[in-house]
Amino acid sequence: DIQMTQSTSSLSASLGDRVTISCRASQDISNYLNWYQQKPDGTVKLLIYYTSRLHSGVPSRFSGSGSGTDYSLTISNLEQEDIATYFCQQGYMLPRTFGGGTKLEIKR
């Protein structure tokens, strides 16, 4: 199986900040990389697919980039509603494995 690693398990930022979350695959996944958002209430939403394509209804402050084994999700101008845990997932090969998640919190 392809292993997905999110080296940062939690991240603190202030509202209005630009935040970048990284993800690394154990092999080249040819841009088949998705990002999901899990809210504190458990609601899960697809944000980005195929590295950089925004899912319908997702605000443009979210963006994705990367290639090969290294990928990132960037949130520009962080808003309160963005507080959540973010997971990367590779869609290159079955099983479609996930990273361990990065929990985004407000800096106090």
From Swiss-Prot:
Ranges where the record places region Complementarity-determining-3: 89-97
UniProt-annotated stretches for the region Complementarity-determining-2: 50-56
Annotated spans, Framework-3: 57-88
Keywords of this entry: Adaptive immunity, Disulfide bond, Immunity, Immunoglobulin
Region (Framework-1): 1-23
Transmembrane segments: none
Residues covered by region (Complementarity-determining-1): 24-34
Location of region: Framework-4: 98-108
Keyword Magnesium applies: no
Top-level taxon in the UniProt lineage: Eukaryota
InterPro entries: Ig-like_dom, Ig-like_dom_sf, Ig-like_fold, Ig_sub, Ig_V-set, IgV_Light_Chain
Disulfide bonds: 23-88
Cellular component GO terms held in the UniProt record: immunoglobulin complex
Residue numbers spanned by region Framework-2: 35-49
One of the protein's GO biological processes: immune response
PROSITE patterns noted in UniProt: IG_LIKE
Note: Anti-arsonate hybridoma protein.
Listed name of the protein: Ig kappa chain V-V region HP 123E6
